[in-house]
Amino acid sequence: MTPPRMPWPGSDSPSHVFSHVERQMVEEEAQAVLLRGQEGSFDAAAAQHSHLPAPVRQRLSTAGPAAEHNVQLFNVRFAPRQARLSSLFKELQDKHHKKGDALKKLRAAAQEFSALATPFSACKNRCQHCCHVPVALSQSEARLIGKQIQVQPQSPKDSAWLKEKPYGYEHPCPFLTPTGCGIYEARPLACRVYLNMDNDDLLCRLIPGQAVPVPLANATSFYQLYMKVTEGEPLADIREYFPQGLGQAVSS
């Protein structure tokens, strides 16, 4: 996993992502496709990362085909639902919705996507490595989560976390418990669609100061629509909205 990695592509410049949504329809992009792992890119990564531990380098040489196989299995399961999800994406793209309503629909779709893909991913074992990297979300989603878990989110004006992108096992999510995510049913959209399509968690294990490619499922459509329905709101890390996790003041 790369040190600066977080579950938002382009999160340093959300306005750029938003403008991209305005130019591109996304209704046909729901089907999972690897972000990396095609055309031998993982083989190339293995050669370029000679400084990584030997087991990681060896895995990089096989991760692409393994992940592609898992994606194919997922696609078979996903096919009957693709048209409905594509229709929802088109609706959210074309029609005006109240922000909260649109975000609820998108989060529900992300949960469905996650439930279908997880059995074919390394995430089926809920390894928790990604619970130690920045997780970006909007103020609107923070409010939705806060309402669901009955915790009042703070309102960060600037996100030091998303600028500095600290990561490591010394930076756990405030909702992480010894048994896993303490708000799993309410977790951010970014967490729902962040799926390693390899066979196990080896490439997700955090190595200080080292970048490790991970064959992620393609959730670009979710990210793009998220920026549209939240109207380009600034993003902040989950730790900045909920620094004390479930120990924060209960919302009214």
Language model features by range: what are they?
Residues 2-129, 133-180, 184-252:
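Short loop/turn segments that flank or connect secondary-structure elements
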